Amino acid sequence: ILVYADEAYEADNVVKDGTCANLVLDDTKSFMVNEDFQATKVTLNRSVNAGNNTMCLPFWVNKEDMKAESIATFKEKAENKSVVTFVKVDHVEANVPFIANYNEAVTKFTFANKGVAKTEDLGTTFIGTYTPGSAKGKYGLTTDNTFKKGGAGAKTKAFRAYLELPEVSGAKTLSLDFTDGETTGIEDATISFGNKGVKVYSLQGNLIATASSMSELHLNNGIYIINNKKVIIK
């Protein structure tokens, strides 16, 4: 809850003359901004697991802010297919829901000098939420990197996001895919990456291996993302 005051107070979440010295966000509590303000320090009390996590915040962030390996915003839900595509980006604007990928769990986030935006549109199809509550009928991201439709007892916490699809879609589970905005297909060919460093990710965005060159890698047969290209190893 924000308090708009005429005088300064030594307390959290007090906004005076368009500035908040210490903003504390908690994923068990609702949050709403009636008008833009500047936050000198922001603490976000929510944890993320290793892997992919949904997120929505009232200020601009990049992956360094989020301590993330990558961040991605919603692109599309393929017509007549149970696949949802996200595009990896450098930063995300305020009130735009996104997915952040982590190599390890994080239990708290801190930010400095953030412009906190008025709570307005939090997305369509992929929708952010600043309010804990029911997730019945909404598609939430699971630990197996699929979006699953919530049942009667499904709940969500604040500062997360979910998919909302028409009932006619029928699908109870949707798979997750990522693109870097340049290469979206699977390249079934020999690809040279030269002598530059190589990073190998699973299709779910988890880092599998790193090497100084392809010759140093010993991968099992499968599909991988290698230096932002999808590659089949046979």
Task: Outline where the language-model segments fall.
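A short, polar beta-strand/turn micro-motif
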Residues: 4-66, 87-187, 232-234
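Generic serine detector
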Residues: 30, 47, 70, 82, ...
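Short glycine-aromatic motifs
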Residues: 72, 139-140, 224
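Short linear interaction motifs
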Residues: 78-86
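A residue-level signal for beta-strand positions that form part of recognition/binding surfaces
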Residues: 83, 123, 197
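C-terminal outer-membrane/trafficking sorting elements
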Residues: 182-234
